[in-house]
Amino acid sequence: MSDRLLVLVRHGQSDWNLKNLFTGWKDPDLTEQGVAEAKAAGQKLKTQGFVFDVAFTSALTRAQHTLDLMLTELGQTGLPTTRNLALNERDYGELSGLNKDDARKKWGEEQVLIWRRSYDVPPPGGESLKDTLARTLPYYVQEILPCVLRGERTLVAAHGNSLRALIMVLEKLTPEQILKRELGTGAPVVYRLNADATVASVVDLAG
């Protein structure tokens, strides 16, 4: 029986996470803490005996750097890796680069909360979580899932909202449930899938 392993990891803390800025498709790198989180994720996976056949990441530096650091810890720096903007973070449009407190002053706390926590209301010029799902899910179905179902042990390093989109489908969550799902930076979530692509087991390696 093939393993059908899929491990999802949110990138380590970025410079803009630290500064409380909306990041989206902007491209800051990891902080020192983010580097440490990524290395720790790789060490955790190695300690538990994980070996991978293929990796996927976004077109953004913070996710790519996280993946590179994990692969170094795993001793798998030559792993075949695909980078694609379909796995990018949700695009925050006009909010991108703004301090979250400044955004609240400009648009009001209630409106900013709606943009951040509603499923289908996008910020000006940006994406809702529903929009993010619309670009992330086809990529998962067409590119990532076939690898997993072939028994290729698959590692994905991406972003809070692009991973939420995948988790929503994997775990069959409602919009209300996925909006409450928090993903820690550098915390692997380990899925094993059945032959029909449903989830056989899920283990969160946070902490």
UniProtKB/Swiss-Prot annotation:
The record's listing under SMART domains reads: PGAM
Site-annotated residues for Transition state stabilizer = H159
Alphabetic keyword roster: Gluconeogenesis, Glycolysis, Isomerase
Which pathway is recorded for this entry?
A: Carbohydrate degradation; glycolysis; pyruvate from D-glyceraldehyde 3-phosphate: step 3/5
Q: What EC number(s) has UniProt assigned to this enzyme?
A: 5.4.2.11
Q: Name one GO biological process term.
A: gluconeogenesis
Provide the reaction this enzyme catalyses. Answer: (2R)-2-phosphoglycerate = (2R)-3-phosphoglycerate
Where along the chain is the active site annotated? H11, E89
Which InterPro entries does the entry link to? Answer: His_Pase_superF_clade-1, His_PPase_superfam, PG/BPGM_mutase_AS, Phosphogly_mut1
One GO MF term attached to the UniProt entry = phosphoglycerate mutase activity
Q: Which cysteines are joined by disulfide bonds?
A: none
Residues involved in substrate binding: 10-17, 23-24, 62, 89-92, 100, 116-117, 160-161
- Which PANTHER family would you find in this protein's record? PHOSPHOGLYCERATE MUTASE
Q: What does this protein do?
A: Catalyzes the interconversion of 2-phosphoglycerate and 3-phosphoglycerate.
The family line of this record is:
Belongs to the phosphoglycerate mutase family. BPG-dependent PGAM subfamily.
Quaternary context: Homodimer.
Q: Which NCBIfam families match?
A: pgm_1, PRK01295.1
**Protein name, as recorded:** 2,3-bisphosphoglycerate-dependent phosphoglycerate mutase
Give the species.
Rhodopseudomonas palustris (strain BisA53)
The gene name on file is gpmA
